[in-house]
Amino acid sequence: MSPRKTYILKLYVAGNTPNSMRALKTLRDILENEFRGVYALKVIDVLKNPQLAEADKILATPTLAKILPPPVRRIIGDLSDRERVLIGLDLLYDEISEEMLGSAELDTLADDDIASPDS
């Protein structure tokens, strides 16, 4: 089994607002439950560090960016929907692919889907 990828994420927030705190809490819950220690999260307050927001072309908060592994993906706005966050960052697809690749069901399904010349 190959080692799991490490995900590098940046969460851009605007101050210590309820929306920012909710986004951070939801994101940490998702990361702890789904990625257990194989991630690094940097929280950037765009009010304290506007140059970082400008350099990364952040126009709205909260914005979550997946930096690594490529490609870079961003999700802007409400982060309360777990599935939306995972799909938006291409994380759910990786999770499903790894599960399928490790299962015997994939082999069975692939064999059943191959059409024989007789049919």
UniProtKB/Swiss-Prot annotation:
Record Gene3D superfamilies: Glutaredoxin (3.40.30.10)
Subunit structure: May undergo a major conformational rearrangment; in the free state forms homooligomers. When bound to KaiC switches to a monomeric thioredoxin-fold (KaiB(fs)). The active oscillator complex is probably KaiC(6):KaiB(6).
Function: Component of the KaiBC clock protein complex, which constitutes the main circadian regulator in cyanobacteria; it may modify the ATPase activity of KaiC.
Family: Belongs to the KaiB family.
Free-text note on domains in this protein's UniProt record: Has 2 forms, fold switches to a thioredoxin-like fold (KaiB(fs)) when bound to KaiC.
BP-aspect Gene Ontology terms: circadian rhythm
Pfam families: KaiB
Assigned keywords, A-Z: Biological rhythms
Organism field: Prochlorococcus marinus (strain MIT 9313)
S-adenosyl-L-methionine as UniProt keyword: no
Note: The kiaA gene has been eliminated from Prochlorococcus during genome streamlining. It has been suggested that the central oscillator in Prochlorococcus does not have to be as robust as in other cyanobacteria because the former live in specific niches of the Earth's oceans; they divide exactly once a day and at the same time. Thus gene loss and changes in kaiB function compared to other cyanobacteria, can occur.
This protein's name: Circadian clock oscillator protein KaiB
Keyword GTP-binding: no
Family matches, as SUPFAM superfamilies: Thioredoxin-like (SSF52833)
